[in-house]
């Protein structure tokens, strides 16, 4: 019998969750999909993939016995929703960021542990086949010791309402850098090339992270780009690996002036792999109950908090210069 899944939040990314779940339903891994969004108009799109639709989470949990609930709503709602929904399901999938502060993240993790539940936070690039293949190649020493990571995520989409580029995109770069360096904790962070919208929300930025061992990561993220740029480049002592995150099946390796393309067979989209991971039996002793590990979840929030703090100072300086 497949799992019964609820999805709270049916916006652009919520619909991607519903599409993925619909495919998993055809494979027999899911028996029912129940969608929820506070906007009634979302019914039209959601009903293409979900068995039912409602406009509040209380109705969702009252009408259905749920195994898993995905929270795909604005970040400022994640904490309260997660704390409430953990009383009604065995697992939660919370899109990143898990919350807006380390306190919120710790509170959710504590509730997961208290209820003996499972938690998956949507650090999706940890499930990207090409990134994981690149890390495997790096461990063989083919490009030498990993020294630098360049992470680019520029989209030609317009920013959403009340945007925060750190919570929406930079968090992917921070987590991917730490993950690629073997869960290494950064030492310092600086923010440059900052662009704010009319309401002083950050919409473009470049983050520079340093790590122990003279390692570094440069993260460039933003909306309103001229074209899409979704590249991650790994720089080793004797070569490079380029990953296009828009595809999970290919990477380009350059060593000693030679280039080769590595094609990954039977690659699946990262969101599909996230759901497959979460759908493994809850009593699977080999699987972590919380993923990424709690310290990695909190680490990402910590550095996003620091980035937000830095731009508050920058915003004040901009105001003073205008005056």
Range-by-range predicted roles:
Residues 76, 99-157:
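A contiguous active-site-proximal alpha/beta segment in oxidoreductase catalytic domains
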Residues 68-73, 212, 277-323:
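C-terminal helix-rich "cap/oligomerization" subdomain common to oxidoreductases
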Residues 1-48:
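N-terminal Rossmann-like dinucleotide-binding module
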Residues 17, 49-111:
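Beta-loop-alpha module in the N-terminal Rossmann-like domain of NAD(P)-dependent dehydrogenases
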Residues 16, 41, 262-276, 292:
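Active-site loop of classical SDR/Rossmann-like NAD(P)-dependent oxidoreductases
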Residues 30, 88-90, 115-117:
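A short helix->loop->beta-strand "cap" motif at the edges of active sites that frequently abuts
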Residues 94, 119-121, 243:
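Hydrophobic residues in well-ordered beta-strands that form the structural core
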Residues 168-248, 275-285, 322-323:
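Contiguous beta-strand/loop segments that form the cofactor/metal-binding neighborhood of enzyme cores
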């Amino acid at each position: 019998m497949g799992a019964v899944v609820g999805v709270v939040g049916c916006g652009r990314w919520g619909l991607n969750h519903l599409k993925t779940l619909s495919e998993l339903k055809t494979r027999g891994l899911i028996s029912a999909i129940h969608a929820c969004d506070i906007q009634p108009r979302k019914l039209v799109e959601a009903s293409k993939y979900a068995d039912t639709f409602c406009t509040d989470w209380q109705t969702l949990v009252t009408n259905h016995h749920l195994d898993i609930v995905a929270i795909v709503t604005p970040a400022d709602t994640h904490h309260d929703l997660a704390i409430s929904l953990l009383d009604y399901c065995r697992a939660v999938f919370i899109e990143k960021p898990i919350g807006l502060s380390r306190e919120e993240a710790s509170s959710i993790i504590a509730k997961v542990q208290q209820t003996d539940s499972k938690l998956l936070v949507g650090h999706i690039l940890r499930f990207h086949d090409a990134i994981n293949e690149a890390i495997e190649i790096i461990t063989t020493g083919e490009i030498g010791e990993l020294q630098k990571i360049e992470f680019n995520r520029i989209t030609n989409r317009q920013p959403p309402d009340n945007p925060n580029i750190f919570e929406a995109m930079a968090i992917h770069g921070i987590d991917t850098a730490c993950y690629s360096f073997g869960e290494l904790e950064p030492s310092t962070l600086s923010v440059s090339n900052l662009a704010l919208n009319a309401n002083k929300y950050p919409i473009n930025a470049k983050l520079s992270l340093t790590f122990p061992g003279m390692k570094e990561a440069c993260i460039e993220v933003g909306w309103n780009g001229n074209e899409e740029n979704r590249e991650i480049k790994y720089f080793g002592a004797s070569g490079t690996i380029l990953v296009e995150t828009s595809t999970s099946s290919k990477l380009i390796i350059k060593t000693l002036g030679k280039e080769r393309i590595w094609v990954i067979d039977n690659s699946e989209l990262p969101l599909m792999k996230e759901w497959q991971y979460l759908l493994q039996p809850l009593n699977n002793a080999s699987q972590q109950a919380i993923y990424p590990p709690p310290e990695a979840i909190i680490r990402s929030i910590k550095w996003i908090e620091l980035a937000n703090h830095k731009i508050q100072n920058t915003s004040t300086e901009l105001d003073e210069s205008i005056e």
